[in-house]
Amino acid sequence: MEKISDLIECIAYEKNLPKEMISKVIQGCLLKMAQNELDPLARYLVVEENKQLQLIQLVEVLEDDDERLVNDPSKYISLSKAKEMDPSVKIKDELSYSLSLESMKQGAINRLFKDLQYQLEKALEDSHFEAFQKRLNSVLMGQVILVDHNQNTFIEIEQQFQGVLSMRHRIKGESFKIGDSIKAVLTQVKRTKKGLLLELSRTTPKMLEALLELEVPEIKDKEIEIIHCARIPGNRAKVSFFSHNSRIDPIGAAVGVKGVRINAISNELNKENIDCIEYSNVPEIYITLALAPAKILSVEIKKIPIEELSAEEKESIQERFIVNNHLQKAKVRLLDIEKSKAIGKGGVNVCLASMLTGYHIEFETIPSVKENAENENEKETPKVGVEALESLFKN
């Protein structure tokens, strides 16, 4: 047993496995070997004595005429034979025998060592799998080792694991070559015949959230919380923040002095424009903030039962806007000169605002009031944007 213990300690040191795991693996392999090589019906136990593992066979003491002595001799011993070894033994006592590997054939020993190696490798993989499962949605960094013909990028992570960044999880316009360093978020851990495969992404909103947590210490310290995040990767993103500390401005903390924090993140994401928004639990205010830089006059929230929607509406509405079988809809009133800002280039602004807030947004435009010197009745300039919304919710 000493040689086995020395071998396991050596492997454990090389593989950086905990001693408890090693002990469990050894015991399992010894028990398996005993059942396969000695007697599958016997009862075995592995115990630790003087920092060495001992393989023990257990037998129960029975009356001399008990039928189980004939039917199952590997598990039982007669009282008369037991007393020859220990005069004080009684019925139902258990006797134990220490078994030595030296009495076993070389083939059995080789199979034991092979099984130990396999089980240790499996235990190591299980340990790494669990460790990476805990790191899901966190940023990993590695070096490109291969870009295949489908533009899937294979990355060496921590000098022993392989990650893959598929083309569809790559920001549009990005290209990588062997030797490049890459940051990406871990989205899935897979077991393959060659070992663990780490699936990575640079397009998921979780990538932006993870980078913000790395760059903004107030988020890691839980003084600021990311509430929602919406992205069109490589183009534009909107992130809403809430401060749990009244002394900390969540937007100022996220942006940093002269934009140093948010610019660092933008550069990592291929110059993606990132809008930082303060979260509000009042949907009307939240939607108004999300549609910036457009100035909004008012927001009307509607929750429409699905059964009241037409077939065409059901097909066009995205599932993210359906909550408790109701369509979450926001009717936004704004001046006609503000509509293009609210929609944004290619519809990006309104798309991100909808993704961020969870509301299907529709616009109602109001003609702009032009200055007219001949107008007899001078009108007060209406409030717009958040100022207008907040005035509606004041007591």
From Swiss-Prot:
GO terms for biological process: DNA-templated transcription termination; transcription antitermination. GO terms for molecular function: DNA-binding transcription factor activity; RNA binding. Gene3D superfamilies: 3.30.300.20, Nucleic acid-binding proteins (2.40.50.140), NusA, N-terminal domain (3.30.1480.10). Keywords: Cytoplasm, Repeat, RNA-binding, Transcription, Transcription antitermination, Transcription regulation, Transcription termination. Transmembrane segments: none annotated. One of its GO terms (cellular component) is cytosol. It is found in: Cytoplasm. Residues 243-291, 331-378 form the KH domain. SUPFAM superfamilies: Nucleic acid-binding proteins, Prokaryotic type KH domain (KH-domain type II), Transcription factor NusA, N-terminal domain. Residues 137-201 form the S1 motif domain. Belongs to the NusA family. PANTHER family: TRANSCRIPTION TERMINATION FACTOR NUSA, TRANSCRIPTION TERMINATION_ANTITERMINATION PROTEIN NUSA. Participates in both transcription termination and antitermination. Monomer. Binds directly to the core enzyme of the DNA-dependent RNA polymerase and to nascent RNA. HAMAP family: NusA_B. NCBIfam families: NusA. This is Transcription termination/antitermination protein NusA. The gene is nusA.
